[in-house]
Amino acid sequence: MDEYDLGIGVAPGSSSKAIVESYETPALNENECKPWLRKMWCIQKITPEYRKRMYRLLGLYKKDYDSLHPLVCMDEKSKQLLEDNRHPIVARPGSLEKYDYEYKRKGTCNIFVAIAPKAGMRYTKVTDTRKKRDFAYFILDLVEKHFPEAEYIQLVMDNLNTHFEGSLIETFGEQKTKELMRKLRFIYTPKHASWLNMAEIEINIMDRQCTGTRIESKENLSVTLEKWTEDRNENKCTIEWKFTRQHADKKLSKHYVA
């Protein structure tokens, strides 16, 4: 390399190699710097109301299952229906299934999931929409179909704008809602803390085992989901919650505010 390629002079007896090295950009260590990766994390100041709700949930999660007052966690998620443009090539010994990246959008539907984590029972339902009416009828199923013998259900939910008593009143009227609410205790996660709802864990498992693939119709989704739900219930698949109040105070106390 010419000694003046960098636009600077070189003192007699010095090495142009040293100058070149000093102007080279250090190589990025592929194990240390991955600028294309990002992590989403939402942790706000934890108010007394946040802590009150969190402590209540963590206390309930420690208790044994009570069939008269079952603890049930509920959540919902949208599912995009997709149809393959071309038939996939089925898997064979030594060869994975192959499918084309192109697909047709066939609309969306909604999946309700409720789980009694200590009992190992879950209940799912597919609806066309995620409106107040859909929520109300899923709650009706929980009370009258799935837990008819319970004195009341302790129902854990997030703060979605349909997850309130008003949805029941709008759908069934005040008298029927009063009857239902005598058998319900709504328990809400803190805002921005849906991770405290064990139904999210069940939905993640559902996506990995059942609904994470392309499904082209509501009917096929309902059949597939019903079979998965039955298998999980037959095996009494429970969720063991390990995060305690002590863990919360240790990990989150720096965010606590008075």
What kind of region is each of these model predictions?
Residues K45, N85, N220-A258:
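C-terminal domain-tail junction helix/linker
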Residues V20-C33:
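Major-groove recognition helix of helix-turn-helix-like DNA-binding domains
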Residues A150-F164:
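Acidic/histidine-rich, metal-coordinating catalytic segments
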Residues L6, V10, M54-R133, Y137-L140, ...:
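Extended, low-complexity cationic-aromatic segments
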Residues D134-Q154:
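Short, basic/hydrophobic alpha-helical segments
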Residues M1-V20, D64:
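A short, amphipathic alpha-helix used for macromolecular contacts
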Residues K98-Y103, K176-M198, R214-I215:
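RNase H-like polynucleotidyl transferase catalytic core
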Residues K191, A199-K218, D231-N233:
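Active-site proximal helix-loop segment of RNase H-like, two-metal nucleases, encompassing DDE(D)
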